[in-house]
C-alpha cells in the first residue's frame, strides 16, 4: 500500500512577504502577497482561496504550520496567532518552523547549496543569522542568533542568502559569500510546509495553546488587535467544519 503523506497548511508572515501553502501528497499550492501592514487582513482570505482551489477543507488537513521567527515582531505574531486560531477551530496540532531554516532549504533547492548561511535584516542595525549543512536533510551548525552585521561569522565556505546581505552590504562585504549571496531568498510558506511535514512525521508538533513565536529580542504580549485576528481565524476554522 502507498504511504499516505500528511497534509500541511503553512502560514508565513515574518517579513514583507506574506504567504500560505498547502502541501498535499507531492503537490504544493501557495499564495503570496507583499505589504507587511496588510498581513493580518490578507492571510485568511489567501488561506480560504488556497483550500478552495485544492477542493479541500481544514478537515482534510493534518496540521497547521507557521513560520515562528525570527522576523518582524508583528509578522511572527500574526503567523502564530492565525495558526493558533485555525488550529483551535479545527482541533489540529501546530508545527512551528524557524524562518531561517526555511530560507536555508530554499537556498539548497534553488542553488544546490550544501553549506549555507542565512542572514535576515532585523532592523535597528542588526541581523538574524544562522548556518546550516544539508546532508540528507537540513542540520543547523550555528543556531539562529541576533547580532550586528559584523557578528556574522560563518564557519568554512558557505553560500549566503537573505536580505541582510543587501541591507548591510558594506558591513558584510568582507565575507567571501557576500558577493554571490542570493538576497531574494526570504522565508516562504512552501519551505515552511515542507519542513513542517518532516517534523510532524517525527512527532515534533505542539498544541495550539503551546504555539509561540520565536523571539530573539524581548518578548512582547499580544495586542488587542492581534487577539482579534486569532479569534477571527478560530471562527473561520470553526465555520469551515
Where are these regions (language model features)?
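Surface "functional belts" at beta-alpha junctions
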Residues: 1-4, 27, 38, 93-187, ...
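N-terminal beta-alpha supersecondary unit
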Residues: 2-68
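Residues at secondary-structure transition points
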Residues: 34-42, 73-77, 81, 98, ...
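Short, hydrophobic alpha-helical segments
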Residues: 51, 196-204
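DPxDG-like acidic metal-binding loop motif
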Residues: 65-99
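Flexible, glycine/charged-enriched surface loops at secondary-structure junctions
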Residues: 205-209
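Extended, charge-rich low-complexity interaction segments
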Residues: 211-229
Amino acid at each position: 500500500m502507498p504511504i499516505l503523506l500528511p497534509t500541511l497548511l503553512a502560514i508565513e508572515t515574518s517579513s514583507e512577504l506574506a504567504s500560505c501553502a498547502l502541501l498535499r501528497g507531492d503537490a504544493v499550492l501557495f499564495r503570496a502577497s507583499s505589504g507587511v501592514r496588510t498581513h493580518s487582513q490578507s492571510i485568511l482570505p489567501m488561506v480560504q482561496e488556497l483550500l478552495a482551489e485544492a477542493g479541500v477543507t481544514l478537515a482534510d488537513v493534518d496540521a497547521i504550520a507557521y513560520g515562528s521567527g525570527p522576523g518582524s515582531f508583528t509578522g511572527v505574531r500574526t503567523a502564530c496567532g492565525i495558526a493558533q486560531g485555525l488550529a483551535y477551530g479545527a482541533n489540529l496540532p501546530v508545527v512551528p518552523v524557524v524562518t531561517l531554516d526555511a530560507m536555508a532549504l530554499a537556498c539548497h533547492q534553488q542553488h544546490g547549496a550544501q553549506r549555507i548561511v542565512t542572514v535576515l535584516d532585523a532592523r535597528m542595525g542588526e541581523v538574524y543569522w544562522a548556518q546550516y549543512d544539508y546532508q540528507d536533510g537540513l542540520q543547523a551548525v550555528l543556531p539562529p542568533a541576533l547580532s550586528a552585521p559584523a557578528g556574522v561569522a560563518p564557519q568554512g565556505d558557505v553560500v549566503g542568502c537573505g536580505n541582510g546581505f543587501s541591507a548591510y552590504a558594506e558591513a558584510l562585504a568582507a565575507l567571501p559569500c557576500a558577493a554571490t549571496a542570493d538576497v531574494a531568498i526570504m522565508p516562504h510558506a512552501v519551505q515552511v510546509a515542507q519542513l513542517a511535514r518532516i517534523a510532524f512525521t517525527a512527532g515534533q508538533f505542539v498544541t495550539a495553546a503551546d504555539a509561540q513565536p520565536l523571539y530573539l529580542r524581548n518578548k512582547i504580549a499580544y495586542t488587542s488587535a492581534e487577539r482579534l485576528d486569532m479569534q477571527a481565524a478560530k471562527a473561520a476554522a470553526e465555520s469551515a467544519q
